């Protein structure tokens, strides 16, 4: 599922909203801001859309085992029906996620939101900066950063579950 943060929305909507990037010394204010007030409704609409059915490239039995791994290890952040805590307004500092803070530094909250997982299989590379080429790399990253201590078989099961979403 694509996501429009304020940076993307302003650039894609012809610069008709407020935008700042302290690294570049840019702080643009529009009156009225034609973008910012609409982002919550746009996000709600995007989250209401059903994900396309997953590709037939996952093993259902393995994915079911992976669902159990997910429930134990991942639901702290991926909590609602779309697999994100975004609707709760939760943001995560770069050090919580093990991500480079460069992208987060461009956002208002200087933090990352939890990406929705529905339809995840259809849009690699992963993470805000595209640094994980595969779901295996995503699982390895969070196993290391969150000290999940997953076995190789649990990781494989979790990847199959993610492919099923």
Predicted regions and their residues:
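Periplasmic c-type cytochrome electron-transfer domains
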Residues: 1-165
């Amino acid at each position: 599922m694509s996501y429009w943060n304020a940076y993307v929305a302003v650039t894609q909507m012809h610069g008709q909203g407020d935008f700042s990037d302290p690294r570049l010394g840019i702080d643009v204010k529009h009156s009225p801001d034609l973008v910012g007030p609409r982002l919550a409704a746009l996000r709600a609409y995007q989250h209401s859309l059903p994900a396309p059915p997953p590709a037939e490239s996952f093993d259902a039995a393995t994915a079911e085992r992976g669902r159990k791994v997910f429930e134990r290890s991942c639901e702290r952040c991926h909590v609602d029906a779309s697999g994100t805590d975004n609707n709760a307004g939760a943001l995560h500092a770069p050090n919580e996620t093990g991500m480079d803070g460069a992208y987060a530094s461009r956002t208002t909250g200087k933090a990352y939101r939890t990406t929705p997982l529905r339809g995840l299989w259809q849009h690699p590379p992963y993470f805000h900066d595209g640094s994980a080429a595969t779901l295996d790399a995503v699982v390895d990253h969070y196993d290391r950063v969150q000290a999940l201590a997953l076995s190789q078989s649990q990781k494989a099961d979790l990847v199959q579950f993610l492919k099923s979403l």
